[in-house]
Amino acid sequence: MDNVEQAIVRIARSSDLCSISRIYARSMRELGKESFEWLRAVLRTRSKRIVTLVCELNGEVTGFTIAYKKRNAAYIESIAVDESARGKGIGSMLLSELEKTLAKKGVEKVYLSVKSWNIAALNFYLGKGYGLKGVVFIMTGDPDYMTTRYIPGYTVMEIAASRLKKYRIRPTTWWSNLVEDIDLSIYKKFYKEERAIIVKKDNRVKAVTTYSVNDELVVDNISLSSYNAIEALEATIMALRNIAVASGSRLIEIPVDASKRQLVKLIKEYGFKVRDSEYLLMKDLSTNH
């Protein structure tokens, strides 16, 4: 803790991109698979709903945090500290300053997710007053060995995510309720790599999925017209399977709330298995500030 006195937390600037990307790359297993281009897009997006802070220690950026705000709630997308600066209280500083900033903006509840294997991070957040809100399964399947079915009556359109509109449909992961709007804004303005598929029946939108594709096809979010729209989910899975095969992707990854039992069951029937899980945590700032 001796070095914390020389540390300052400030709003991130575009010139911090290289430092943030370096820290992110070293923390990818803990945080996820976002690209350099995505981080750059986040920093370039001028929105009052995005809060990005960095911590400087002796003039060098050693940590950062990104959060999305939606009305009186916020979702912490990431907090990361450079390996060389860990154990000095920087993570606590970043979280504390972020919570203060969000509280000033009218945020009452803050949410975040922690990978189930990351016990150190889980204990860190529990120690800061966060509690368990839910669990998300990360389910994966090999497209070459998936069950294939023909789902009649549905049409599938593949587009760039930047062309997506806002639809009145329900995400299959809880955090998407908070991040979907700002993600779409980033896609439209700066980030062109993300793809989307729209599933329709009788000219009505039944499902929307955003994803990125490389060695693996990684789904960011699947939204359905209702949680009973099983056929629409099946048509979506078939479309993802076809895209993965055409792209040479070896796996498809889909996140889904563990509480959505019917959806989990269906995805398993197509050959998917739970490869990982994430804890959703929440803290009520109205009782702390």
State where each predicted segment sits.
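Active-site rim helix/loop that mediates acceptor-substrate recognition in acyltransferases
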Residues: 17-21, 28-57, 61-66, 174-196
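Conserved beta-strand in the GNAT
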Residues: 54, 60-68, 75-80, 198, ...
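A conserved beta-turn-beta hairpin within the catalytic core of GNAT-like acetyltransferases
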Residues: 68-77, 86, 212-222, 274-278
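Conserved acetyl-CoA-binding loop-helix of GNAT-fold acetyltransferases
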Residues: 81, 87-100, 123-127, 229-242
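Conserved active-site alpha-helix within GNAT-family acetyltransferase domains
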Residues: 92, 116-134, 258-276
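Conserved GNAT acetyl-CoA-binding A-motif
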Residues: 102-113, 246-256
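Conserved catalytic-core motifs of GNAT/GCN5-like acyltransferases
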Residues: 111-114, 131-144, 273-285
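Amide-forming acyltransferase catalytic core, primarily the GNAT-like/NAT-type
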Residues: 132-216
